[in-house]
Amino acid sequence: MPNIFDKGMGYISPEDKQVRILARDNYRIWITLIHICLLLLYINVSSAQENRESAGVWGDQQNGTYKNPVLNADYSDPDVIRVGDSFYMVCSDFHFMGMPVLKSNDLVNWTIIGQVYHRLNIDSKYNTMEKYGGGSWAPSIRYHEGKFYVYFCTPDEGLYMSTATDPAGPWSPLYEVKKTGGWEDPCPFWDTDGQAYLGHSKLGAGPIIMHKMSSDGKHLLDSGTTVYEGPTAEGTKIYKRNGYYYIIIPEGGVGTGYETALRSKSIYGPYERKIVLEQGKTNINGPHQGGIVDLDSGESWFMHFQGVGALGRVCHLEPVKWVNDWPLMGVDNDNNGIGEPVSEWAKPNVGKKFPICAPQTSDEFSGKQLGLQWQWNHNPVDNKWSLNKARGFLSLSAMKAPDNKHAKNTLTQKLMGKLGVVTTLLYTDQMALGQKAGLCLLGGNIHEIGLIKTDSGIYVYADNNGKLIIGKTIKQNHLFLRARVDLNNNHTILQYSLDNKNFIQLGDDCILSDYNYWKAVRPGLFSYNIKQDTGVAQFDWFHYQHDGPSGGLH
C-alpha cells in the first residue's frame, strides 16, 4: 500500500497528489491521535537532543543567550514596539509586495504574522516591473489607544499610513497622508497631552523635520519645522522618557555610520547630540537605524540593522543602559562613553522561556493562501497564479517577458543565514512553447535553474547572470531543482535531479551580487514566456534548509 502521508519526498503525479490530500482529510482524526502519541514519546525521549539540533549558528542558542544577528535575513530598516507581553516589528521591502509584520515574545525568536498590504496601487509602474528601488522605504510602527499604526514613504509618490486593531490584520487600505516626493523614514508620535506629531527626513538623508499631525494620524497640520541637521541624518524614531524628547537616528551612511541620540525638553529643540553606538573594534560595520523597547524588568533593548552584502541588511539586538538620561547601546569596551555592538549576549529578561523559532520559509502549497513569507516582485497579476487550479500546487501562468527582471509574478522570499539549500519540484505537463520556469536567485545578478520548452522538447537549463547553459532533454513530466547558497564564499551552485536523490550541477558556480535596489538576493519561483502569453508551471512544494534556528542545516 502506498504511503499516503509521504508529502513531497519524491515524485507524485498531480492526480495521485489530490487523492492523497483527500485521504488526509478523511483520516484527520486518526492522524491527529497518532501524532499526539508520537509527540509525547518524542518529548520524553529526546527533548534535550531536540534543543541541541534546533539551535542554529545565529539567534537563540537555547542556553539563555543569543548570537547576533538575531534575524540573519534582509529585514531592512526595522522598527520594533512592545505591546503588553509581545513585540512587533516591521521593515522596508521596497518593490516587493508587501510589508511583513513580525511577532516575538522575547525579541530573539520571531515569526511572521501578517502583511500590511499586498500591492501598491499608487503608480502603474508597479504593474509593469519599472519600480525597482521604489515602494516602501523605512517604516515605523506605533500603538496608540488600542490601534496599531504603520507609516512609510515611497521615494516618488508620498507618505502613507495603515491601521489595524490586530497586528496580524486585517490592515486598513493604505491612506495617502501627503502626496509628495523626496521624503523618507517617517515616525509618528502622540504626546502625553494628546497632540500628535510626525518626524521624517528627506531623500538623501536629512534634515530631520517635525510636523504637527491630527490625532487620527491622517493629516499633517503644518509645513514642518527643521529640528536637526547632521551628516546623513535619517531613520527618525521619536520617544519620550523622563521629561526628555528623544530622536534616535543613524548618521554617517549605511556602511560606515553610527547611531546618534538627540534629546531636548521640547519636541522642537534645540537638541543635544550624542553618539551612542559605533562599530569600534567589532566587525559590525555601520550599526544603523532601528527601534528601542523597554521591558517590565527594567531592561531596554535596541534592534538595528547591519548591511552585509548579498544577504542584505540583517537585524542585531543590543542591550541598552541609560546613563545620565542618555542611552548607551551595546557595550562600552574602550570606556569612551560610546557603545559597541555585541556578538553574543544574555537574552532579554521577559520572565518566561519561549520555544525557538525563525520566520517561515518552506511551503507545501496545500493551503488556501500563500505562506506569509512570500512576496511578489512588483504587483502580482492575480488571475495568472493559483493554489486552486490544481489543489496542492502553486500554478504560475506564464506572461511574455524577455528575461527574469521583467517577468511578472515571480514569487520570492528572503534568504535566511549564510548557508542554505533551496529545493522545489516542478511539473511540465502544461508548459508551452517558449516558456521558462523554475527556481531563481533574484538580485543584482540573476541566476536561474529551470526548464525551457522548445520545438525539439523540454530541456533543463541554467542561466548564470546572462550566461545560458542548456542541459539534457527532460522526458519525464517533473524535475527537482535546487540552489545551494554559500554566502561565506558569496556563491551558489545550481543543480537538478530526476529522483530527488542524485543532484547534478549545471554550469559554473554563480557569484552572488551585493544587495541591489536596496534589497538582498532572494530565492524565488518564476514562470515566463519569451514568445507569448501562454503556459503554466506547477510547483509541488518549496523546501528551504538554512543555518539558523530550526533551520535544519547546522
Predicted regions, residues:
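Bacterial Sec-dependent N-terminal signal peptides
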Residues: 1-4, 8-14, 19-50
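Carbohydrate-active catalytic/glycan-binding domains of CAZyme proteins
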Residues: 48-554
